[in-house]
């Protein structure tokens, strides 16, 4: 017997969560003024006119450091559920997680040798 009625709340929430942003964009497009005057085209910075050049150039080192951080942050997200159910899953999952961590360590060593973790 199919128990599709158990998912009614899920489908209702999914439909509502799709319709609300679509309606919000549609209503804002209908109600928003179309003309762009000089005030709309001017630069705005914290309520006052900007002083100096507004363009900043970030070094690629910050980008690489952020990328390495995101990779290891995602690693934590993947390893936490594994650690919580370690005793139930068995040895094969331990070997898979070990290989996963080994690949990440190789990536860390590569990033370290390329200088992605140096601030100077």
UniProtKB/Swiss-Prot annotation:
- What are the record keywords, sorted? Chloroplast, Membrane, NAD, NADP, Plastid, Plastoquinone, Quinone, Thylakoid, Translocase, Transmembrane, Transmembrane helix, Transport
Topology in the membrane? Multi-pass membrane protein
* Highest taxon in the source lineage: Eukaryota
Subcellular location, principal: plastid
* The reaction(s) this protein catalyses: a plastoquinone + NADH + (n+1) H(+)(in) = a plastoquinol + NAD(+) + n H(+)(out); a plastoquinone + NADPH + (n+1) H(+)(in) = a plastoquinol + NADP(+) + n H(+)(out)
Q: Name one GO molecular function term.
A: NADH dehydrogenase (ubiquinone) activity
- The enzyme's first-digit EC class, named in words, is translocase
Coiled-coil regions in this chain? none
The cellular location(s) given in this protein's UniProt record come to: Plastid, Chloroplast thylakoid membrane
Tell me the Pfam families matching this sequence: Oxidored_q4 (PF00507)
The EC designation for this entry is 7.1.1.-
Q: Which GO terms describe its biological process?
A: photosynthesis, light reaction
Subunit organization: NDH is composed of at least 16 different subunits, 5 of which are encoded in the nucleus.
Sequence similarity: Belongs to the complex I subunit 3 family.
Known function? NDH shuttles electrons from NAD(P)H:plastoquinone, via FMN and iron-sulfur (Fe-S) centers, to quinones in the photosynthetic chain and possibly in a chloroplast respiratory chain. The immediate electron acceptor for the enzyme in this species is believed to be plastoquinone. Couples the redox reaction to proton translocation, and thus conserves the redox energy in a proton gradient.
- What's the protein called, per UniProt? NAD(P)H-quinone oxidoreductase subunit 3, chloroplastic
This chain's source organism reads Solanum tuberosum (Potato)
> Which gene does this sequence derive from?
ndhC
């Amino acid at each position: 017997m199919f128990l599709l009625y158990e998912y009614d709340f899920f489908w209702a929430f999914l439909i509502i969560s799709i319709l609300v942003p679509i309606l919000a964009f549609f209503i804002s497009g209908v109600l928003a003024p179309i003309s762009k005057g000089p005030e709309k085209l001017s630069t705005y910075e914290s309520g006052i006119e900007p002083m100096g050049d507004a363009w900043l150039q970030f070094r690629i080192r910050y980008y690489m450091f952020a990328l390495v951080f995101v990779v290891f942050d995602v690693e934590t997200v993947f390893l936490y559920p594994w650690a919580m159910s370690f005793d139930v899953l068995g040895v094969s999952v331990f070997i898979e997680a070990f290989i996963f961590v080994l690949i990440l360590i190789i990536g860390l060593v590569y990033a370290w040798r390329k200088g992605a973790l140096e601030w100077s």
